[in-house]
């Protein structure tokens, strides 16, 4: 991209933008919630649409001059409905957290009981964490993973639902590597008269391409981000049954947001179009293949994988047998050019700022073109770095740079 105007106007910011570009180009990105957008998505984000304020919805705006952005938003809505087979879509949420908030405000009152996945077992802050608005406003009861299998035990979820009679059951996760059974969760919700909301922020790309079962036929509401496996701009979206469309839209605007970000909605529309192409399914298939190979390679080096593997794009690694914390592993690997994040593991004994594990994802490196052989090399580099954490890391930095040079970012 051309940043001539930025360089003339603000050298400091232009310099930092360039530094970040170089960091991304010369690092192996394993953060499961990150990806690299296409140039088309990036151009939409930096377009003239950023100038337009458009409170309301297409044909029902509070400002004039919205006929063009109405077309943009309609395109985004229609494309994402086609992508997921949904009855209604709202593409205005600024983030996944705000998408979840809008659903809660649509069907809950403060103090209502909600069943959601424990953050330390792979859930998300907005699924009831006490430090988040969700845990402060609503009475969340948490379910987790089985101590032995480290996967969701649906009978335990059912028992909790029968005991606490939640008004809403929340499914989905930020660090869960296995298939989620939405049909069974729908049956549990029906048994106790609860709504079902599924947060597919991490697995949206897999769901869109049929590589993970879709929650759309079963859930009352489906929320997502657009910047993870969907490979779009940072933002959120909500899908729902038509009967909830009016109340949902009201709880985005005027409920929790004002004017939508029309340049971001345009970029969402572009990413939905890209996701409808056959090449996107090929990409997502490679994401999953890469995750499987990377998981197997790490396991061969003696790393303990939570639930012993993965069905999707991410791997949760328990480092308790490697004499290193998640925090120290994150810092160590960052120093050689591999970026990932510390993460709690089931039955965690350390604080969330230290943790016993790391979370690894393959979407971003797959976007660059990395395939199975590169996964084996990445596993080898990670293993060598942790084994030689107090030694000379320069050879490992060189191996990382060699991989990055082989697959340019843009």
From Swiss-Prot:
<protein>
    <recommendedName>
        <fullName>Serine hydroxymethyltransferase</fullName>
        <ecNumber>2.1.2.1</ecNumber>
    </recommendedName>
</protein>
<dbReference type="Pfam" id="PF00464">
    <property type="entry name" value="SHMT"/>
</dbReference>
<keyword id="KW-0028">Amino-acid biosynthesis</keyword>
<feature type="binding site">
    <location>
        <begin position="123"/>
        <end position="125"/>
    </location>
    <ligand>
        <name>(6S)-5,6,7,8-tetrahydrofolate</name>
    </ligand>
</feature>
<dbReference type="GO" id="GO:0019264">
    <property type="term" value="P:glycine biosynthetic process from serine"/>
</dbReference>
<dbReference type="GO" id="GO:0005829">
    <property type="term" value="C:cytosol"/>
</dbReference>
<dbReference type="InterPro" id="IPR015421">
    <property type="entry name" value="PyrdxlP-dep_Trfase_major"/>
</dbReference>
<keyword id="KW-0808">Transferase</keyword>
<feature type="binding site">
    <location>
        <position position="119"/>
    </location>
    <ligand>
        <name>(6S)-5,6,7,8-tetrahydrofolate</name>
    </ligand>
</feature>
<comment type="subunit">
    <text>Homodimer.</text>
</comment>
<dbReference type="GO" id="GO:0030170">
    <property type="term" value="F:pyridoxal phosphate binding"/>
</dbReference>
<dbReference type="InterPro" id="IPR019798">
    <property type="entry name" value="Ser_HO-MeTrfase_PLP_BS"/>
</dbReference>
<keyword id="KW-0963">Cytoplasm</keyword>
<keyword id="KW-0554">One-carbon metabolism</keyword>
<dbReference type="InterPro" id="IPR049943">
    <property type="entry name" value="Ser_HO-MeTrfase-like"/>
</dbReference>
<keyword id="KW-0663">Pyridoxal phosphate</keyword>
<feature type="binding site">
    <location>
        <begin position="351"/>
        <end position="353"/>
    </location>
    <ligand>
        <name>(6S)-5,6,7,8-tetrahydrofolate</name>
    </ligand>
</feature>
<dbReference type="InterPro" id="IPR001085">
    <property type="entry name" value="Ser_HO-MeTrfase"/>
</dbReference>
<dbReference type="InterPro" id="IPR015422">
    <property type="entry name" value="PyrdxlP-dep_Trfase_small"/>
</dbReference>
<feature type="site" description="Plays an important role in substrate specificity">
    <location>
        <position position="227"/>
    </location>
</feature>
<dbReference type="InterPro" id="IPR039429">
    <property type="entry name" value="SHMT-like_dom"/>
</dbReference>
<comment type="pathway">
    <text>Amino-acid biosynthesis; glycine biosynthesis; glycine from L-serine: step 1/1.</text>
</comment>
<comment type="similarity">
    <text>Belongs to the SHMT family.</text>
</comment>
<dbReference type="InterPro" id="IPR015424">
    <property type="entry name" value="PyrdxlP-dep_Trfase"/>
</dbReference>
<feature type="modified residue" description="N6-(pyridoxal phosphate)lysine">
    <location>
        <position position="228"/>
    </location>
</feature>
<comment type="function">
    <text>Catalyzes the reversible interconversion of serine and glycine with tetrahydrofolate (THF) serving as the one-carbon carrier. This reaction serves as the major source of one-carbon groups required for the biosynthesis of purines, thymidylate, methionine, and other important biomolecules. Also exhibits THF-independent aldolase activity toward beta-hydroxyamino acids, producing glycine and aldehydes, via a retro-aldol mechanism.</text>
</comment>
<comment type="pathway">
    <text>One-carbon metabolism; tetrahydrofolate interconversion.</text>
</comment>
<dbReference type="GO" id="GO:0004372">
    <property type="term" value="F:glycine hydroxymethyltransferase activity"/>
</dbReference>
<dbReference type="GO" id="GO:0035999">
    <property type="term" value="P:tetrahydrofolate interconversion"/>
</dbReference>
């Amino acid at each position: 991209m051309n940043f001539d105007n930025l360089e003339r106007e603000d050298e400091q910011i232009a310099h930092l933008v360039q530094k970040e570009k170089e960091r991304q180009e010369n690092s192996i990105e394993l953060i499961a919630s990150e990806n690299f957008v296409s140039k088309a998505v990036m151009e939409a984000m930096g377009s003239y649409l950023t100038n337009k304020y458009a409170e309301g919805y297409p044909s029902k705006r509070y400002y004039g001059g919205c006929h063009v952005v109405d077309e943009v938003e309609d395109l985004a809505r229609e494309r994402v409905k086609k992508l997921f087979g949904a009855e209604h879509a709202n593409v205005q949420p600024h983030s996944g957290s705000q998408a979840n908030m809008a659903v809660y405000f649509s069907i809950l009152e403060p103090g209502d009981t909600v069943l959601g996945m424990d953050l330390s077992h792979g859930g998300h802050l907005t699924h009831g964490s006490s430090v988040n608005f969700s845990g402060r406003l609503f009475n969340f009861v948490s379910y987790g993973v089985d101590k032995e299998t480290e996967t969701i035990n649906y009978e335990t979820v059912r028992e909790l639902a029968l005991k606490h009679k939640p008004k809403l059951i929340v499914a989905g996760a930020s660090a869960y590597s296995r298939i989620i059974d939405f049909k069974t969760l729908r049956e549990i919700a029906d048994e106790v008269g609860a709504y079902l909301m599924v947060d597919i922020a991490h697995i949206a790309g897999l769901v869109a391409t049929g590589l993970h079962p879709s929650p759309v036929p079963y859930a009352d509401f489906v929320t997502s981000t657009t910047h993870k496996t969907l490979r779009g701009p940072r933002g959120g979206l909500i899908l729902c049954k038509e009967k909830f469309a009016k109340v949902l839209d009201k709880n985005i605007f005027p409920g929790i947001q004002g004017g939508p970000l029309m340049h971001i909605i345009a970029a969402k529309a572009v990413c939905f179009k890209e996701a409808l192409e056959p090449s996107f399914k090929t990409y997502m298939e490679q994401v999953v293949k890469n995750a499987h190979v990377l998981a197997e390679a790490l396991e061969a080096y003696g790393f303990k994988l939570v639930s012993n593997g993965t069905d999707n794009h991410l791997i949760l690694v328990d480092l308790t047998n490697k004499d290193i914390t998640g925090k120290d592993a994150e810092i160590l690997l960052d120093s050689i050019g591999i970026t990932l994040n510390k993460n709690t593991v089931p039955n965690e004994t350390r604080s969330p700022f230290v943790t016993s594990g790391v979370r690894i994802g393959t979407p971003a490196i797959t976007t660059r073109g990395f395939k199975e052989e590169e996964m084996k090399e990445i596993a080898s580099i990670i293993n060598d770095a942790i084994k030689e954490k107090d030694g000379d890391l320069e050879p490992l930095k060189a191996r990382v740079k060699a991989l990055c040079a082989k697959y340019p970012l843009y």
